[in-house]
Amino acid sequence: NDFKFEVTDVQKKLGDLFVHYGKVINGSIKLKDNVELKINVKRRDDTRAYHSATHLLHESLRRVLGDHVTQKGSLVEPSRLRFDFSHMKPIQNEEIDKIESFVNQIVSKKSEVKTRLMTPDEAVENGALALFGEKYGDEVRVLSMGDEDGKYFSTELCGGTHVKNTGDIGKFKIISQSSIAAGVRRIEALRD
């Protein structure tokens, strides 16, 4: 039949099991039916770019506002990103300009995006940021972006999909910032 299922989210569960969430667009399916997977390349590429931009935004926030900035949540879609982080006061226009400038400087360098597998201890020794309280296995994936005189601009633990080089992100623009809870700010951003 002409069964079509649109995947809207993928989450890793119980070790190496990946669960695909979505909705049936057309047709029907029964247990043990064979299906053909077709990736929506544009959606994947746009999501990769926004996800990579989120990592550059996080490091830029830390450099402009201070090391107290930690990720509190995020949303990455093919058309935008939203990033929630710890910070006690509104971000000034000059600070927003600096944050955007940091991201766009790394984008313009078209630096290779690198991923490596290592132990959590090795990741921390290499300067990788990790989410506090998360449980990690014996091996973690470390994402590094943006060459700055032989050092990386951003290094974090991440298992997601990313661009091959920072130039694939495109121009980055913050479109809003707001408070969503005491001590938690939200930034929304777009890319060209």
Predicted regions and their residues:
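A glycine- and charged-residue-rich anion-binding loop/surface
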Residues: 1-192
